[in-house]
């Protein structure tokens, strides 16, 4: 074996090797013997099949297994020469050449190594943080909203006309071309006007109706409607209004506090205001982080934390981004890429910068998470997906299974870890007085929920 190994940098190495044809052929008998012990061929007892017959019938498999053995031997020798073990690798080596010549094989491969990351410049990367403290006006607005959310609906007199924020009980049925359509009918359906639970034009058509009244009205489904068979279609709806209920106003006082903070002993309006202030503070912080500071922090980490990246992982990320992009392309563009290898290569190459940044940030986040002992439990991943399913009207178990089948659970967990690491760094950079506010408010702010 003629082997040459070159370490390009701390995260990359390359090997080139030449092996004689005999190196491959000498493996045939041993591999054929292994196959002969397992296969069953008519006319022969198991384990008694002649090697000549096995070699003839399983020639392709024997040659493939021999090549794989030869490649593994080359890699083993390359690792030994580099002074590395499997634990030092990141991903699998990328075989870039395996070519058979007249007398020998030529093999080339790129090897990715776990990068060395120094985190001594992290503090320089974290932008200054200042969260808006909720003022009295914002607190009062939230208290009014809570009073509205927790108000009970009560029956109204027969003369009342339906208005926004009323709760209606209706029967409805929709028709397209004089025929009912799937999902277009319901009885004793509860709808809060103005909630956008139904299409805006549907809710507007109910304004001013009275209990016992029936009404017909046309409605055009939006062109981007989620049910494709209805998108852009004109429909006729027939509606019967059975009941109108209005919210019974709640006063903002200690009684409201006892309703909102039902699990809190001796709840008072003063305590409720403190809880509201805490929740608003956390909301302001989350908005500032998500809309501005996290992206700024990521840009700084990318710029200031310098280390060698394994090119094999960057190439894999480019492949992933390219494949994902294909799903959102028009059929004509996909066809154009399929017909031109040069165009496809150029398109894939356009993702190199994004792939490099993504790989780099992932390594940095992983290193920070280990250093600060920040993690995410599998149950938290499932809870996140369960919430996503509830918000999108999907079956939670089906959604989780879909993520599992597509090997996407690890990506969800990594995204959650990234979010926690970035928030942790930003929280540490809050002014001291705001850190104290955060520590005081964090345990209690989640106790306030919508009614």
Curated annotation (Swiss-Prot):
Any one Pfam family match given in the protein's UniProt record, by short name: Trigger_N
SUPFAM superfamilies: FKBP-like (SSF54534), Triger factor/SurA peptide-binding domain-like (SSF109998), Trigger factor ribosome-binding domain (SSF102735)
Gene: tig
Example GO molecular function: protein folding chaperone
Family indicated by similarity: Belongs to the FKBP-type PPIase family. Tig subfamily.
Compartments, as annotated in UniProt: Cytoplasm
GO biological process, one term: protein unfolding
Domain description: Consists of 3 domains; the N-terminus binds the ribosome, the middle domain has PPIase activity, while the C-terminus has intrinsic chaperone activity on its own.
GO annotation, cellular component aspect: cytoplasm
All residue ranges annotated as the PPIase FKBP-type domain in the record: 165-250
TM annotation in the entry: none
The protein's name in its UniProt record: Trigger factor
Enzyme Commission numbers on file: 5.2.1.8
InterPro entries: PPIase_dom_sf, PPIase_FKBP_dom, Trig_fac, Trigger_fac_C, Trigger_fac_C_sf, Trigger_fac_ribosome-bd_bac, Trigger_fac_ribosome-bd_sf, Trigger_fact/SurA_dom_sf
Keywords tagged on the record: Cell cycle, Cell division, Chaperone, Cytoplasm, Isomerase, Rotamase
Catalysed reaction, written as an equation: [protein]-peptidylproline (omega=180) = [protein]-peptidylproline (omega=0)
EC top class, as a word: isomerase
Purpose: Involved in protein export. Acts as a chaperone by maintaining the newly synthesized protein in an open conformation. Functions as a peptidyl-prolyl cis-trans isomerase.
